[in-house]
Structure formats: structure tokens, C-alpha cells
Amino acid sequence: MSAKGGAIKDKWKMKKWYSVITPKAFGEVSLGSTPAYDITQTIGRRVETTLYDLTGDFSQVYVHLYFKIIGNEGDRLITRFVGHELSRDYLRSLIRRKSSKINSIFDVTTKDGYVVRVKGLVLTTYKCHQSQKTAIRKIINETVSKKASELSFDDFTQEVVFGRLANEIFEAAKKIYPLRKAEIEKTKVLKVPENLGKQVESSSVSSG
């Protein structure tokens, strides 16, 4: 083995493995481990998983979840939910000819001050008129915005990823035109409450 190869191997051995844990809202489930020379190097890393990996329900395999490492408790890395996305294959499977696809992208604020960008999706049974699309898009926006304002961030994300909010949209929008499916296609956290960020930073420093 070359001296260079040996040095690389030795450097890898110097790394320590840290366990990555989901937030309490997602059951504090292990997302696996990540290596680092120092635990502070893990802060900011993004981890991807699926809802199926957390629940064991294969019907949820198309729901991709994203978490960001924000601190630590000993050797356990604390994460925050930062968004979700439905798989492209799943979305393609929903598309039908001679039907309308209605998207709406907008920002909402939860009861505890998180700002989240939401992409809603509704698919109709047949082609609908522009006025009906506008009415359905309004329902998407109003339903999601109202729910966000009433719920904490943790509760809102549960409503989103488990499909309950999409079901509410479906029930309201089907009164405008026959529907095939409603989904929250994607979310992304744009802003967290300022005081929360300071608390996380303090926790990370004291636990390091």
C-alpha cells in the first residue's frame, strides 16, 4: 500500500460515526449514521428518507422526506423537518389524457411562526373550464393557509405528509368539478422562528 493510501485510510479511521434521529413529531426514529472528525461538521447536513422507512407502510414509499441536522444531544444528531416531495414516478402515474392538472404554489405561516412554501396539486376526471380551475386553485390556497394558521409546525407537517390535508382539499374541490386526486406535491421550509434558531444553537454548544 502506498503512503498516500495509508494516510487516507488512517484519516477515515479517525472519523467518528454519529446517529441521526428524526424530530419527535416523526417518532425520533434513527435515520442511520453519518461520519465526521468533529460533531460540529455535521451541522447543516441534509438527510433524505421516505415515509415508508419511518412507518413500514409500503404504500407510503413515494413520499420523500428531508431533514436537516441542527444540533446534537451527546452523540445523537438532532434534525428538523425541512420539506417533502412526492416521487416523480408517482406523479407521472397520476397523469391522464383529457383531464386537467391544477397546480398552486404559495407560502403559508404556521401558528408558531414557521414559513412554508407549498405546492398543491389537483387532477380532475375530465377537462374543466378555466373558471373552474381558478375556483379549485382558490380552494387549495384557502384550505392550506387556514390549516397552517391553526396548527403548530409539527402538527401541520403531519397533516401534509400523511395526506390528511390533501383529503380536505379533495372533499372541498370536488364540489366544483369531479376529481381524481388531490395531493400536496411538495413543501419547503423557508423560515423558522428566530427564537427557535437561537435555542437550537445554544443546545448544540452545550451538548458538544
Curated annotation (Swiss-Prot):
The keyword Ribonucleoprotein applies. GO terms for molecular function: structural constituent of ribosome. GO terms for cellular component: cytosol; ribonucleoprotein complex; ribosome. It holds the Pfam family Ribosomal_S3Ae. One of its GO terms (biological process) is translation. Keywords: Ribonucleoprotein, Ribosomal protein. Disulfide bonds: none annotated. InterPro entries: Ribosomal_eS1, Ribosomal_eS1_arc. Belongs to the eukaryotic ribosomal protein eS1 family. This is Small ribosomal subunit protein eS1. The lineage of its organism: Archaea, Thermoproteota, Thermoprotei, Sulfolobales, Sulfolobaceae. The gene is rps3ae.
